[in-house]
């Protein structure tokens, strides 16, 4: 393991330092970045063997965009996504468009950092299995949502009215109401005639999909 270089790209300062300390204790040489711009600069300077990438990096490029850019210049680089987002559909990225040979770990699914160490090592060796693809886990949060349901919930979370959603999707308001009803059922929100239904659905969607960031909980 000695001599392998890793770049950590994570905008949560506490988690970033926790990961760096752990990786250094395992013998890696580590550099860290809090945003895509710094990550691209450090990647060019250090030519790391692997990159641990958060997906939600704030304004600008997300982790998926950044991974494609980095792999264009160094295709053999190991990529480990470490994120609160269950799968790429929730940030409007087709799962089939993700780079091959990656690991995808949900922060909430890590009981300790040994899984991350194993994932990084396996990915560097080009031996990734489905066990390291949490985005393909059939039991992941909201795995049952369709593409349309995700789109409707996303637009609701942006404060769009039913009329606005209908206009964006090119459908009728009635079709939107039906899509919202089925989306609420899919995520376990009571769709009774209650003004809180929409608020509850949006809150649950944002929380479970990782689009509202909790505090760092990986130990």
Walk through the language-model features, giving the residues of each.
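Alpha4 helix (beta4-alpha4-beta5 surface) of REC/receiver domains from two-component response regulators
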Residues: 65, 85-106, 111-114
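Basic, Lys/Arg-enriched C-terminal extension of HTH/homeodomain DNA-binding domains
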Residues: 182-219
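The C-terminal output helix
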Residues: 119-137
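Helix-turn-helix DNA-binding segment
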Residues: 134-181
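Active-site residues of response regulator receiver
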Residues: 54-56
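Acidic, metal-coordinating helix/loop segments flanking the phosphotransfer/catalytic sites
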Residues: 32-50
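Two-component/phosphorelay signaling modules centered on CheY-like receiver
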Residues: 12-31
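Acidic catalytic/metal-coordinating carboxylates
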Residues: 35, 59-65
């Amino acid at each position: 393991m000695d001599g392998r270089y890793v770049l950590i790209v994570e905008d949560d300062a506490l988690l970033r330092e926790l990961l760096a300390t752990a990786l250094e204790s395992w013998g890696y040489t580590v550099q860290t970045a809090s945003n895509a711009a710094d990550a691209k600069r450090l990647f060019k300077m250090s030519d790391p063997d692997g990159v641990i990438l958060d997906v939600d990096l704030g304004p600008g490029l997300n982790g998926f965009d950044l991974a494609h850019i980095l792999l264009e210049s160094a295709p053999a680089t190991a990529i480990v996504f470490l994120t609160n987002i269950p799968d790429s559909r929730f940030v409007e990225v087709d799962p089939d468009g993700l780079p091959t040979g990656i690991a995808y770990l949900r922060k909430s699914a890590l009981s300790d950092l040994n899984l991350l160490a194993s994932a990084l090592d396996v990915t560097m060796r080009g031996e990734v299995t489905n066990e390291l693809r949490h985005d393909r886990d059939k039991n992941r949060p909201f795995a049952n949502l369709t593409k349309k349901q995700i789109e409707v919930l996303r637009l609701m979370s942006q404060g769009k009215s039913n009329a606005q959603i209908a206009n964006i999707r090119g459908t009728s308001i009635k079709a939107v109401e039906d899509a919202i009803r089925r989306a609420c059922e899919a995520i376990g929100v009571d769709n009774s005639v209650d003004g809180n239904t929409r608020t509850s659905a949006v809150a649950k969607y944002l929380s479970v999909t990782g689009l509202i960031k909790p505090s760092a909980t990986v130990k």
